[in-house]
From Swiss-Prot:
Domain of life of the source: Bacteria
Name of the protein: UDP-N-acetylglucosamine--N-acetylmuramyl-(pentapeptide) pyrophosphoryl-undecaprenol N-acetylglucosamine transferase
NCBIfam families, alphabetized: murG, PRK12446.1
GO terms, molecular function: UDP-N-acetyl-D-glucosamine:N-acetylmuramoyl-L-alanyl-D-glutamyl-meso-2,6-diaminopimelyl-D-alanyl-D-alanine-diphosphoundecaprenol 4-beta-N-acetylglucosaminlytransferase activity; undecaprenyldiphospho-muramoylpentapeptide beta-N-acetylglucosaminyltransferase activity
GO biological process: carbohydrate metabolic process; cell division; cell wall organization; lipid glycosylation; peptidoglycan biosynthetic process; regulation of cell shape
Localization per Swiss-Prot or TrEMBL: Cell membrane
GO cellular component terms, semicolon-separated: plasma membrane
InterPro entries, A to Z: GlcNAc_MurG, Glyco_trans_28_C, GlycoTrans_28_N
Record: residues binding UDP-N-acetyl-alpha-D-glucosamine: T13, A14, G15, R166, S196, Q291
Keyword line: Cell cycle, Cell division, Cell membrane, Cell shape, Cell wall biogenesis/degradation, Glycosyltransferase, Membrane, Peptidoglycan synthesis, Transferase
Gene expressing this chain: murG
Membrane topology (UniProt): Peripheral membrane protein
Length: 358
């Protein structure tokens, strides 16, 4: 018998979904029944259903910071999304809503507020994303990953919890990861991740440097859907994937180094695994600059090296990887000196407290 019911929401990219999954086992241990509201065709639908969590879909418009003709029609989708979410919440009667952000979350948060249901949100990046900015007035508490984020949260709603780490990420097998890729143990392994949607510029630069890199390293390349290079399918020492789910813990365990974008959820997982990382944040041209702030924070802590997209030319990339290799010991030492509490436990505490105080 469940004590509580939580409806989770968040979507658009994997980064708005995987932290929710990290919380699910602990929520269930604390007596929560867990259900999910997402969009009709977002990445969250497949991820959540694959984890056997009841899923409700709503209409949702995209939140854009740039001009697009769809900006005129999407507000009506958001209004319909509020109506859809309200209908679901009326039927399900959750004790609390937990939001991880993304454009699908806004209608759910507003509907929960209208129904007087407490809302706890979580922001992974240093500065709140647009969805969480819009949601903040309707939230009881907004959990943050970086201490620097608290200054952006009004009305004493901010709580420093850190980023929830999926338990399965910590339990990967190095041997299994090497076996999946058919790698021998004679070379160190670099894992390249361009985010859940892939990154053309990172893909192109890695492949442009491939012959040089394969002299010293084996390469695992998660390149994004539709981005496989058929000419390299049989390349010895190079294993490419469009997207991985179940194999990810083993592939991460097999890696000695990680080259990645700088989304907060991912880099905190790398930190938990003590993996030296070269971060290539999304440029300000393609984002609001949050990944640049995340990456520089990790650089200042000694956890990572940073290479901006503008510097991403062949010689610079290869030299930066060699610099990462030479700094491996120092980076791991900095990571081992980190003081961190269990983020999942802290977030569960905030959720339970919000239910009792609302």
């Amino acid at each position: 018998m469940y004590k509580y019911k939580v409806i989770m929401t968040g979507g658009g990219t994997a980064g708005h979904v995987t932290p929710n999954l990290a919380l699910v086992p602990a929520l269930k241990e604390n007596g929560f029944e867990v259900k999910y509201i997402g969009s009709k065709d977002g990445i969250e639908k497949e991820i959540i259903k694959n984890n056997n969590i009841p899923y409700f879909q709503i209409s949702s418009g995209k939140l854009r910071r740039y001009f697009d003709l769809k900006n005129f029609s999407d507000p009506f989708k958001v209004l319909k999304g509020i109506k859809d979410a309200n209908k679901i919440l009326k039927k399900e009667k959750p004790d609390v809503v937990f939001s991880k952000g993304g454009f699908v979350a806004v209608p759910v948060v507003i509907a929960a507020h209208l129904r007087k249901i407490p809302v706890v949100a979580h922001e992974s990046d240093m500065t709140p994303g647009l969805a969480n900015k819009l949601s903040a007035p309707f939230c009881s508490k907004l959990c943050v990953t970086f201490r620097e984020s608290l200054k952006y949260i009004k009305d004493n709603k901010g709580v420093l919890t850190g980023s929830p780490i999926r338990t399965e990420i910590l339990n990967g097998s190095k041997e299994k990861g090497l076996e999946i890729c058919n790698f021998n143990k004679s070379k160190e392994v670099i894992l390249i991740m361009g985010g859940s949607l892939g990154s053309k510029i990172i893909n192109d630069e890695i492949r442009g440097n491939l012959e040089l890199l394969l002299k010293d390293f084996n390469i695992i390349h998660i390149c994004g859907k539709g981005n496989l290079d058929n000419n390299l399918l049989d390349k010895v020492g190079y294993k490419q994937f469009e997207y991985v789910s179940e194999e990810l813990p083993d592939l991460m365990s097999a890696a000695d180094y990680i080259i990645s974008r700088a989304g907060a959820n991912s880099i905190f997982e790398f930190l938990a695994l003590r993996k030296p990382m070269l971060l290539i944040p999304l440029s300000k041209k393609a984002s609001r600059g949050d990944q640049i702030l995340n990456a520089n924070s990790f650089k200042n802590e000694g956890y990572a090296l940073v290479l901006n997209e503008e510097e991403l030319i062949n010689s610079t990339l290869y030299n930066k990887i060699l610099e990462l290799k030479s700094n491996k010991k120092n980076i791991i030492n900095a990571m081992n000196n980190m003081n961190g509490k269990n983020s999942i436990d802290l977030i569960i505490e905030v959720i339970l407290k919000s239910i009792k105080e609302y």
